Structures are given as C-alpha cells and as structure tokens.
C-alpha cells in the first residue's frame, strides 16, 4: 500500500476531511451549543468516511441521519468503539469485534430508516 492512498487506483480520491477524532464518547445532552456543533461536524466527517469506506447506501445511512436522534446515538457509539480500537492499550482482536458490532448496528440502522420512511432527498422525520 502506498503512503498516499489517493495515488493508488484501488483507493479513489476522496472529498472528506480527516475527523478530529476525540476518543471520548459523545454525551450529547451535556454538551454546550458550541461543543454540540463541533462534535456534530466531527461525526459528519467520520460518517462520510464510513459511508465511503464500507460502500454504505442510503438504506443504512440516510442523508438525513443527523435529523434522527436514534441514528445519531447509534453512529456515535460506532465511532467511539472504532476509535477505541486504535487507542492504547491496543487489542489485536478489537477491530474484529468492532466489525461484528458494526454488522449488528447496520441492521438496526436499516430498521430505523425503514420505519422512518426516509429516502434520498425525502426526509420523513
């Protein structure tokens, strides 16, 4: 793998910025308006990467996911778990466990989106 993945044909050039990636879990109710805004922007960057990296479609992460508290909480938990896989002390099997949790989370995300009835370009919240 090359150091700059954008130069590798397998990794197409992406248009997202690297998230700040604070390793603390996001507890939305206790954040100030500024902290909530910053955390939301960071989470949006991570979700853009997640959607790109795993080829997720709108049935899993709808474009209006930020307007659904249950999706924000689930995605926040996924991000926190993912970050913890890369913090010390490292656990070699942590990413495998995260992927198992991610598989379960995709089912829940899809079910919530299905119940909400949202589609690309159409929010029904």
Regions found by a protein language model. Name each.
Residues 21, 39-42, 58, 75, ...:
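Intrinsically disordered, low-complexity regions enriched in Ser/Pro/Gly/Gln/His and often acidic
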Residues 35-36, 54, 66, 83-87, ...:
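Soluble extracellular-acting proteins and domains
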Residues 1-38:
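The feature captures two recurrent sequence modes
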Residues 88-125:
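Amphipathic alpha-helical binding modules
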Residues 12-24, 44-54, 72-74:
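Short, compositionally biased low-complexity segments
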Residues 30, 34-41, 62-72, 96:
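Short, solvent-exposed segments of well-ordered alpha helices
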